[in-house]
C-alpha cells in the first residue's frame, strides 16, 4: 500500500504546537486539497472509527495539517482506500496530540480506521461482521510504527502559557475581552444526537426491514386469502409464483431504497469533506471564516478546525507582536540622544508605541532620581481614556515605599491593597494595573505602570516580561542621556574654569579674587550660597566674602569657631581634602555642627581648602539650601580646581602688590642717586681742565663710594702725570745722546749685510758642484746595480742551463735503455718468427701428405685434396710473410744498435757540456762578487757626496739666514735711527702736553 510522503511528520509537528512553539504561516502552506479530489472519486464513502468508546469523524486527507511545507496533490482516481484510511488515522492522531488527551495506540487506531473504511458501504447490509483484509491491516500498522519525527524548526522559542485542549473542550474567547498578547481559547460545544455511522445503520435497517416486512405481510395475507384449489399442485405452484414475485418486488424496492439512502448519505458526507478540505487548504488565508456543518462529528471537526485556526491566528498575531516589541526595544536602544532635552520626547514616542502594542489604556513612566528637585512623568493614553495623571501625584506610593518587585493587580475591586492605594486607583479609573519598579543601588528611582481602565485584565507572564524589558531599556536610555549630560557639563565646566581663571587672573588684590570667585562659582555650580571662610591665628574663622541667592539668610561677617578643627582637620585640608556632603542631617555630623549650619538653612555643602604658599589660609564653601543635593564627581572636581585657581590668584595678587612697592622704592632710590651724581659731576668738573688737585666730597651712599673711587683715580692720575713729566725729560735727554750711536750702528749693519751676501753666493756655487758629484755617484751606483742584476740573471740562466743539460743526460740515458730493451724485444720477435716459419714448413709438409693421401683415396678424397691444397697455399704464404718479418726485425735490430751508439755519444757530449757550464758559472760568481764590491764603493761615494751636498746646503741655508738677519739688522738699525728721531719729537711733544697739568 502506498503511503503519503507528506504525512510522516504530522504527529510530531502537531506535538510541537501543543508544546507551545511558535509557528508562522509557512507551516500551513502544506495543507493539501485531497478532499477536493475525493469529490471526483467514485470510491469515496463516509467512514467512521470508534476510539475508546467515542465516535471520531473521519475527515480524510483534508486534515493533513502539518506537512513539511510542500503542498501534496492526490488525484482521486489514483487514491485507494488504504491511503485514505492511513491519512485519516494520522489526522486523528494529530488531533489527539493537539488536544493533549491520553495517547491512543497508533496501530490499533489505524486498524479500526481501516475496518471502518472497508465497511462504510456494506453497513447497510444485514451482515454485521464484514471481512477484514489482514494484510492491509498489517501494512497500515507497520506504516504507523515507522513514522519519523520532523526536523526541528529554526524559529525563536517564545514561552507560552499552558494551552487548553483543542477538542472537545476548546473554546474561543471573546476578542473584545482579550489584549493583543492574550492566547486563551474556548472549546467548541459538542453537538448532541447520533453519529453519522449510527444514523446510516438505522436508516439502512429501516429501509431494508420495513419494505421486506410490508411485502412479507402482504404476501402472507395474500396467501391466507387465496382460495384452496382442488388440485394441490396448482395451489402450490400458484402460491410459489406469487411469493416469488412479491419477494422479487420487495428485494427490488429494498435495493432501490438502500441505493437511494446510500447515495444521499455519500453525497452529504462528500459535501462536508469537500468543504472541510477547502477550509483546511485555505486556512492560512481565511482563518477567521467559520464553516457551517451539521451537528455531528463533522461539525465537531469543523469547530475544531475553527478553534485551531483561531489559535494559529493568535500565535501568528503573538509572533508579530513579539517582533514589533523587539523592534520597539531596538529602536529605543538606538535612539539618537544628541541633547539631554530630547530624552522626554524620545520616551514619549516609544511609550505611545508600546501602549499600542501592549493593548492597555494608559502607560505611565515616572522617574525621580535622588536629590533632584523635579520628577519626570511621561504618559501615553488611548483616545477613549480621559484624564491625565497629575505629575505631582503620579503613583499611589511614597518615595520610600515604592515597591521593589513587579506588582500585578488583575482586578482592583477585589485586590488586597491599602485604602490610599485603592482610592488612587479609583480616582484614575484603573481596573487592572501592572507596575514595574526602577531601582539603582537599592534606591527607587521610578516606575513604569500599565493600566486597563475599561475592565479587569488577567496579566500574563509575557506582558510582565515585556514591561520589564521596556523598563530596563528606558533605564539604559536614561543612563545614556545622563552620560551625554555629564559630557556636556564637563565641557561647560572646562569652559567655566577657563573663563573664571581669566577673570581671577585679572584681579589686582585678594578682595577682588574672593569676590569674583564666590560669585562665579555659585553661578557655575548653581548653588544657593558660596562663602570664603578665613582662619585667624587660633583657627577660628570669619566669613569674609559671600555670594548668596535671594531668599536665603546672609552669612557675611559671621564668626564660626570649631574647637576640634585644629586637631582633626587642619592637616587634612592642608593636604587638599575636599568634603562633599549630600545631606547634613544624614551625614553623621555632631549636633554642634548642625547647629552652626542650621541658621543659614544649609541642607548640603561642598568644602575645599584655600592654600597659600603651603599654608591653610581658609575654606571655600558651597551651600545648597533648597534641599539635599547629590554632588556629582565632575562638580567636585571643578570646585577643587577652582579653589586651586583661587590660591594661585592670591599668590599672583601678592606678587603684583610686592612688585608695585618695589617699583616705588626703586624710583625714589633712582631719583636720589641722580641728585648725588649731579653734585659729584659739579665737584669734579675742574679735573676736565687739568686741575688734578681737586677732590670730591665723600658720603656714605653709593655716590660716596663712587666719589671715593674717583678721588683715588685722580690721585693715581696725578702721580702718573708727575712720573710722565719726569720720564719725558729723561727720555728726551737719552734720545739726544743715543741718536749718533744708533746712526753708526745702522751703517755697520749695512756693510755686514753686503759681506754676508757675497759669502752666500760662494756657498751656493760650491753647493751646486757638490750636488753634481752626488748625481754622478748616484748614476754610477745605478749602473753597478744594473750590472749586478745582469750578472745575477746570467747566473740564474747558467743554473737553468746546467739543470737542463742534466735532465737531457738523464733523458738520453733512459732513452738508451729503452732502445736496448727494444733491441732485445726485436730479438724475441725474431725467435717467434723463426718458430712460425718452422710451423709453416711443418704445415706445408702435412698438407702435402694429406694431398697424397687424398690422391690415393680417389673420388672420395677429392674434396679433402682441395682442402689440403688450400692449407699448403696458406702455409706457403705464411712462410713468405715470416721471411719478410724476419728481414724487418733484422733491420730494426740494426737501426736500434745505431741509435744506441748515437745515444751513448750524445751522453758523453752532454757530460762535457755540463762541465763547461760549471766552469762558466764559477766565473760568473767571481764577477758577481767583484760587482758587489764595486757597488759598495760607489754607494759609499754616493753617500759621502750626498752628505757633503746636504752639509753644503745646510751651510748655504745658514748663510742665507745670516744674510737675512744682516739685512734685517740693517733695516732695523735704519728704523731705530728713524724711531729715535720720532721719539725725540714725541718726547718733546709729551713735555709740552704734561706742562698743562697742575699737580702741586
From Swiss-Prot:
Entries under Pfam families matching the protein: GAF, MCPsignal
Name this protein carries in UniProt: Putative methyl-accepting chemotaxis protein sll0041
Alphabetical list of CDD domains matching this protein: HAMP (cd06225), MCP_signal (cd11386)
PANTHER family per record: METHYL-ACCEPTING CHEMOTAXIS PROTEIN MCPB (PTHR32089:SF114)
GO molecular function: transmembrane signaling receptor activity
Record-linked SMART domains: GAF (SM00065), HAMP (SM00304), MA (SM00283)
GO CC terms, sorted: membrane
Stored InterPro entries: Chemotax_Me-accpt_rcpt, GAF, GAF-like_dom_sf, HAMP_dom, MCPsignal_dom, Phyto_chromo_attachment
Gene3D superfamilies, sorted: 3.30.450.40, Methyl-accepting chemotaxis protein
Keywords, sorted A to Z: Repeat, Transducer
GO BP terms: chemotaxis; signal transduction
Family: Belongs to the methyl-accepting chemotaxis (MCP) protein family.
Protein's organism: Synechocystis sp. (strain ATCC 27184 / PCC 6803 / Kazusa)
Region (Disordered): 1-59
HAMP domain mapped to chain residues: 671-722
Residue span(s) of domain Methyl-accepting transducer: 727-963
Record-annotated GAF domain positions: 342-478, 509-650
Amino acid at each position: 500500500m502506498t503511503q503519503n510522503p507528506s504525512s510522516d511528520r504530522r504527529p510530531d509537528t502537531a506535538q510541537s504546537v501543543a508544546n507551545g512553539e511558535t509557528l508562522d504561516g509557512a507551516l500551513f502552506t502544506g495543507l493539501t486539497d485531497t478532499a477536493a479530489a475525493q469529490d471526483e472519486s467514485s470510491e469515496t464513502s463516509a467512514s467512521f472509527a470508534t476510539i475508546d468508546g467515542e465516535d471520531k469523524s473521519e475527515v480524510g486527507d483534508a486534515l493533513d495539517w502539518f506537512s513539511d511545507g510542500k503542498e501534496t496533490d492526490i488525484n482521486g482516481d489514483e487514491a485507494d482506500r488504504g491511503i485514505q484510511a492511513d491519512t485519516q488515522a494520522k489526522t486523528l492522531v494529530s488531533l489527539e496530540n493537539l488536544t493533549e488527551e491520553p495517547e491512543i495506540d497508533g496501530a490499533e487506531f489505524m486498524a479500526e480506521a481501516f475496518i471502518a473504511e472497508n465497511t462504510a458501504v456494506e453497513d447497510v447490509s444485514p451482515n454485521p461482521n464484514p471481512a477484514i483484509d489482514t494484510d492491509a491491516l498489517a501494512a497500515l500498522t507497520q506504516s504507523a510504527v515507522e513514522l519519523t519525527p520532523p526536523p526541528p524548526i529554526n524559529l525563536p522559542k517564545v514561552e507560552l502559557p499552558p494551552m487548553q485542549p483543542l477538542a472537545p473542550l476548546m473554546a474561543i474567547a471573546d476578542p473584545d475581552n482579550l489584549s493583543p498578547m492574550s492566547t486563551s481559547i474556548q472549546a467548541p460545544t459538542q453537538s448532541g444526537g447520533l453519529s453519522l455511522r449510527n444514523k446510516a445503520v438505522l436508516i439502512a435497517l429501516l429501509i431494508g426491514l420495513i419494505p421486506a416486512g410490508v411485502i412479507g405481510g402482504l404476501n402472507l395475507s395474500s396467501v391466507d386469502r387465496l382460495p384452496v384449489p382442488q388440485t394441490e399442485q396448482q395451489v402450490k405452484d400458484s402460491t410459489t409464483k406469487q411469493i416469488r414475485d412479491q419477494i422479487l418486488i420487495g428485494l427490488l424496492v429494498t435495493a432501490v431504497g438502500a441505493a437511494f439512502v446510500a447515495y444521499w448519505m455519500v453525497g452529504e458526507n462528500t459535501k462536508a469533506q469537500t468543504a472541510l478540505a477547502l477550509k483546511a487548504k485555505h486556512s492560512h488565508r481565511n482563518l477567521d471564516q467559520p464553516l457551517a456543518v451539521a451537528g455531528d462529528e463533522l461539525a465537531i471537526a469543523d469547530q475544531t478546525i475553527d478553534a485551531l485556526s483561531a489559535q494559529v491566528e493568535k500565535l501568528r498575531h503573538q509572533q508579530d507582536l513579539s517582533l514589533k516589541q523587539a523592534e520597539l526595544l531596538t529602536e529605543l536602544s538606538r535612539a539618537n540622544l544628541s541633547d539631554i532635552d530630547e530624552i522626554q520626547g524620545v520616551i514619549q514616542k516609544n511609550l505611545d508605541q508600546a501602549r499600542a502594542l501592549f493593548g492597555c489604556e494608559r502607560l505611565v513612566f515616572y522617574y525621580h532620581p535622588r536629590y533632584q528637585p523635579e520628577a519626570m512623568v511621561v504618559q501615553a493614553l488611548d483616545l477613549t481614556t480621559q484624564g491625565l495623571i497629575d505629575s505631582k501625584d503620579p503613583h499611589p506610593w511614597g518615595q520610600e515605599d515604592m515597591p521593589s518587585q513587579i506588582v500585578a493587580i488583575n482586578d482592583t475591586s477585589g485586590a488586597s491593597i491599602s485604602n490610599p492605594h485603592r482610592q488612587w486607583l479609583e480616582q484614575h479609573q484603573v481596573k487592572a494595573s501592572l507596575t514595574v519598579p526602577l531601582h539603582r543601588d537599592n534606591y527607587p528611582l521610578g516606575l513604569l505602570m500599565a493600566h486597563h481602565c475599561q475592565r479587569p485584565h488577567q496579566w500574563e507572564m509575557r506582558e510582565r516580561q515585556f514591561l520589564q524589558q521596556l523598563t530596563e531599556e528606558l533605564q539604559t536610555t536614561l543612563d545614556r542621556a545622563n552620560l551625554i549630560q555629564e559630557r556636556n557639563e564637563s565641557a561647560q565646566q572646562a569652559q567655566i574654569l577657563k573663563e573664571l581663571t581669566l577673570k581671577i587672573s585679572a584681579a589686582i588684590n585678594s578682595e577682588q579674587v574672593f569676590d569674583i570667585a564666590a560669585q562665579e562659582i555659585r553661578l557655575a555650580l548653581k548653588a544657593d550660597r558660596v562663602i570664603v571662610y578665613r582662619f585667624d591665628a587660633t583657627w577660628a574663622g570669619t566669613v569674609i566674602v559671600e555670594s548668596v541667592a535671594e531668599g536665603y539668610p546672609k552669612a557675611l561677617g559671621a564668626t564660626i569657631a570649631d574647637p576640634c578643627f585644629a586637631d582633626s582637620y587642619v592637616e587634612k585640608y592642608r593636604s587638599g581634602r575636599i568634603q562633599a556632603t549630600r545631606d547634613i542631617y544624614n551625614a553623621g555630623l555632631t549636633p554642634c555642627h548642625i547647629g552652626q549650619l542650621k541658621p543659614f538653612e544649609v541642607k548640603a555643602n561642598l568644602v575645599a581648602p584655600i592654600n597659600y604658599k603651603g599654608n591653610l589660609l581658609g575654606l571655600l564653601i558651597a551651600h545648597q539650601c533648597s534641599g539635599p543635593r547629590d554632588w556629582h564627581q565632575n562638580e567636585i572636581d571643578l570646585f577643587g580646581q577652582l579653589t586651586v585657581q583661587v590660591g594661585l590668584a592670591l599668590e599672583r595678587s601678592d606678587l603684583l602688590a610686592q612688585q608695585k612697592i618695589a617699583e616705588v622704592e626703586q624710583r625714589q632710590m633712582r631719583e636720589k642717586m641722580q641728585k648725588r651724581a649731579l653734585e659729584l659731576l659739579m665737584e669734579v668738573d675742574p679735573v676736565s681742565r687739568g686741575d688734578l688737585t681737586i677732590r670730591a666730597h665723600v658720603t656714605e651712599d653709593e655716590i660716596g663710594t663712587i666719589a671715593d673711587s674717583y678721588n683715588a683715580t685722580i690721585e693715581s692720575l696725578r702721580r702718573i702725570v708727575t712720573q710722565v713729566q719726569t720720564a719725558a725729560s729723561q727720555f728726551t735727554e737719552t734720545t739726544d745722546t743715543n741718536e749718533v750711536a744708533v746712526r753708526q750702528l745702522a751703517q755697520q749693519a749695512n756693510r755686514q749685510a753686503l759681506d754676508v751676501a757675497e759669502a752666500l753666493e760662494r756657498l751656493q756655487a760650491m753647493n751646486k758642484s757638490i750636488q753634481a758629484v752626488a748625481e754622478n755617484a748616484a748614476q754610477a751606483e745605478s749602473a753597478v746595480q744594473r750590472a749586478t742584476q745582469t750578472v745575477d740573471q746570467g747566473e740564474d740562466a747558467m743554473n737553468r742551463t746546467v739543470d737542463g743539460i742534466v735532465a737531457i743526460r738523464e733523458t738520453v740515458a733512459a732513452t738508451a735503455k729503452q732502445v736496448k730493451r727494444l733491441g732485445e724485444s726485436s730479438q724475441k720477435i725474431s725467435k717467434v718468427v723463426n718458430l712460425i716459419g718452422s710451423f709453416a714448413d711443418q704445415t706445408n709438409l702435412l698438407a702435402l701428405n694429406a694431398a697424397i693421401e687424398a690422391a690415393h683415396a680417389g673420388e672420395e678424397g677429392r674434396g679433402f685434396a682441395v682442402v689440403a691444397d688450400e692449407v699448403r697455399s696458406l702455409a706457403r704464404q705464411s712462410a713468405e710473410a715470416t721471411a719478410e718479418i724476419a728481414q724487418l726485425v733484422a733491420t730494426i735490430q740494426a737501426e736500434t744498435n745505431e741509435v744506441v751508439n748515437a745515444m751513448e755519444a750524445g751522453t758523453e757530449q752532454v757530460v762535457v757540456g755540463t762541465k763547461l757550464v760549471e766552469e762558466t758559472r764559477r766565473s760568473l760568481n767571481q764577477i758577481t762578487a767583484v760587482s758587489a764590491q764595486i757597488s759598495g764603493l760607489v754607494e759609499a761615494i754616493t753617500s759621502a757626496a750626498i752628505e757633503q751636498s746636504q752639509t753644503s746646503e745646510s751651510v748655504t741655508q745658514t748663510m742665507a739666514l745670516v744674510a737675512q738677519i744682516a739685512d734685517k739688522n740693517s733695516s732695523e738699525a735704519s728704523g731705530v735711527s728713524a724711531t729715535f728721531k720720532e721719539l725725540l719729537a714725541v718726547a718733546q711733544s709729551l713735555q709740552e702736553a704734561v706742562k698743562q697739568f697742575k699737580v702741586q
